[in-house]
Amino acid sequence: MKKVHKSWESPCMGKSMDLLIYGSEGTPLILFPSAHGDYMEWEKRGGIQALEEQINEGYNQVFCVGDFAGESFLNHAIDPIQRLSRFSQYQSYVMDELLPFISEENSNPYIIVSGVAIGAYCALLMAMKYPTNFQKVIGLCGYYDIRVHMDDFIDNNVYFNNPVEFISNLNDDKILKLISNVDIRLLNYMNSPTKNETQIMSDILWLKYIEHEQYVWDIESDDMWEIAPKMLKDNLF
């Protein structure tokens, strides 16, 4: 399996950002890390091994990006406004740096984005906010309400980065149609700590007539990383 490490000084993040690339061709797949994870997390947790066939056969080229939650939502050394500000910088990094880099590496315009837990939140949020840039999102064991990380702080920035809120109140038919064009998959398993949160997000999407697929696997586990890579593999096609 071809594996390449890339790193550059990110103007958006104000620091060096690492990236691991697996494979050399196929549909681009961006993988966000979970809480306190980094660009190596998917490989360390068996996710890349689970995708070995897709990568080696040229079905997917995988891009594992660096941490966002540890410096933003989970950083309680800074206030909620600063947490969201840091996350906004991360979104800018994805849109203004990562996507142009991927387009130079891979001519396929179809972009899949995925993540586990808070990584699933990031993946879904990016697809909802930028539905013309991402064609498919696979949320794995995700939760989609970031108010749990905001210390009861509420403002417009929280609102527009919180899918359970801004999607619920979105009435612009043009934007809703663009979002409906995204292939949305939300997956979880029976005893997952985020199963209810995934169901809530699915219910909101249905209320807005946004077509998507939502599955709860009939399996139990004490470790979502035991199941999430298998879910991802089954939903890439």
Each model region followed by its residue ranges:
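Non-catalytic cap/lid and distal C-terminal segments of serine-dependent acyl enzymes
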Residues: M1-F237
